Amino acid sequence: MGSEAMLPVALLIGYLLGSIPFGLILTKLAGTQDLRSIGSGNIGATNVLRTGRKGLAAATLLGDALKGTAAVIIAGYLGGSNAAMLAGLGAFLGHLFPVWLKFRGGKGVAVYIGILIGLLWPYAIFFCLVWLATAFASRYSSLAALVASVLTPIVLWAFGHTALAALFALLTLLLIYMHRENIKRLRAGTESKIGAKK
């Protein structure tokens, strides 16, 4: 299959991998309450942490990141760099809007990191360092994710990675949209801080 013909396949591969709801699967296997009825109702690692199962939350974070990385690596091997980037976009969309869960998924932070790892891993380290610094200073997980995701495409662009900067600018816009309720709570001063009980 030619590289051009591979592009829609890469998008589909990414979407299907991204649609795997690790948080929901792991919490069901562990016999906990339906994740969608806990806390924010989100299927990501932050909400899994609200079950009190730190191991499950870590496993969810890892699984969600790995599906982004796997999509990029598989598509890159089959169709090159453009296919890899499209697979990353597909994985992100799959996580946010999974077909298996009536298009109601997670917020995309772990998958964002996983895609960065697959495409240009040093920038995943940059993202995590910014996240940690912001989270330490503010105690807000959502704010840390927003700051790190906004800075990532700017830094990619500054170092000449224009195609990747464009991709991650799009992912950042989607991530901001998925955090719109968090942004409202941050502005109102009602957002939960890291370590706070809900």
From Swiss-Prot:
Transmembrane feature ranges: 6-26, 56-78, 83-101, 113-133, 154-174
EC number: 2.3.1.275
GO CC term, one of those recorded: plasma membrane
Main location: membrane
Key word Signal present: no
GO biological processes: phospholipid biosynthetic process
Subcellular location: Cell inner membrane
Pfam families: G3P_acyltransf
Membrane topology: Multi-pass membrane protein
Single GO MF descriptor: acyl-phosphate glycerol-3-phosphate acyltransferase activity
Assigned keywords, A-Z: Cell inner membrane, Cell membrane, Lipid biosynthesis, Lipid metabolism, Membrane, Phospholipid biosynthesis, Phospholipid metabolism, Transferase, Transmembrane, Transmembrane helix
Subunit structure of this chain's protein: Probably interacts with PlsX.
HAMAP family membership: PlsY
Function: Catalyzes the transfer of an acyl group from acyl-phosphate (acyl-PO(4)) to glycerol-3-phosphate (G3P) to form lysophosphatidic acid (LPA). This enzyme utilizes acyl-phosphate as fatty acyl donor, but not acyl-CoA or acyl-ACP.
Family, as annotated: Belongs to the PlsY family.
PANTHER family: GLYCEROL-3-PHOSPHATE ACYLTRANSFERASE-RELATED (PTHR30309:SF0), INNER MEMBRANE PROTEIN YGIH (PTHR30309)
Name listed for the protein in its UniProt record: Glycerol-3-phosphate acyltransferase
Organism in which the protein naturally occurs: Bradyrhizobium sp. (strain ORS 278)
